[in-house]
């Protein structure tokens, strides 16, 4: 089995063993990042074209602010209306799959890459990856880290500075290091924000503004 196939299958692999396909992907990754991060700040169109040409899947109306960093890029899938703010890092030695309407605040890091606990085996330059899956309608606060193998459900808020080491269920607010569920997002919470939104739209109508 080639080292790339081992890597993408969450098996131990060695980056020191020659694998032409993996090396070609790494080269293309560098070219992609050079182009992406050299765009002008307001050139959203070019950045969208670049990620559509390199990510595994991209839904409608994505927006990623530069700088952006990744291990490969071609193992990343993002759904509709995906937004990543400044300095997002995705280490995608295994697949990263993100749903619709997901917001990443500045300095969010999503890691699929891992190293053996054994120092002896680490010294042999063996590594592994575990996929990360994020559902729909998720907001991840700034400076948060999503660790290898984590699954985050849908309709979730992750508080700033969280270190997510275990799965997070749907419909909750979670935060901390390690990240834990704080409370459920219940009907009362939904009603509170609906009332705030209704007030906002009422103000727009009074001002003669339509969206």
Can you annotate each of these PLM segments?
Residues 1-61, 179-183, 187-211:
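Terminal amphipathic alpha-helical/low-complexity segments used for targeting or macromolecular assembly
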Residues 11, 142, 160-162, 177:
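Gly/Ser/Thr-rich helix-start
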Residues 41, 68-78, 83-151, 177-178, ...:
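Flexible, glycine/small-residue-enriched loop-and-beta-strand segment within the central core
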Residues 50, 66-69:
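Arg/Lys-rich RNA-binding interfaces used to dock onto structured RNA substrates
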Residues 53, 76-78, 168:
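Short, T/G/N/S-enriched strand-turn elements that build extracellular solenoid repeat scaffolds
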Residues 63, 133-135, 139, 151, ...:
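A generic "structured core" feature
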Residues 169-170, 175-178:
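Acidic, glycine-centered active-site loop in nucleotide-sugar glycosyltransferases
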């Amino acid at each position: 089995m080639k080292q790339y196939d081992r890597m993408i299958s969450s098996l131990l692999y060695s980056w020191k063993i020659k694998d032409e396909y993996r090396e070609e992907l790494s080269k293309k990754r560098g070219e992609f990042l050079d182009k992406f991060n050299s765009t002008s700040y307001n050139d959203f169109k070019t950045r969208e074209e670049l990620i559509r040409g390199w990510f595994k899947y991209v839904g409608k109306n994505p927006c990623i602010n530069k700088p952006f960093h990744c291990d490969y890029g071609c193992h990343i899938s993002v759904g509709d209306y995906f937004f990543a703010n400044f300095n997002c890092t995705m280490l995608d030695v295994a697949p990263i799959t993100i749903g619709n309407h997901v917001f990443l605040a500045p300095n969010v890091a999503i890691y699929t890459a891992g190293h053996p606990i054994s120092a002896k085996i680490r010294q042999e330059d063996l590594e592994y990856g575990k996929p990360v899956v994020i559902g729909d309608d998720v907001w991840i606060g700034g400076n948060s880290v999503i660790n290898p193998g984590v699954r985050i459900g849908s309709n979730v808020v992750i508080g700033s500075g969280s270190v997510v080491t275990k799965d997070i269920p749907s419909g909750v607010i979670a935060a901390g290091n390690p990240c834990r569920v704080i409370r459920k997002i219940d009907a009362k919470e939904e009603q509170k924000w609906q009332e705030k939104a209704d007030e906002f739209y009422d103000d727009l109508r009074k001002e003669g503004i339509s969206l």
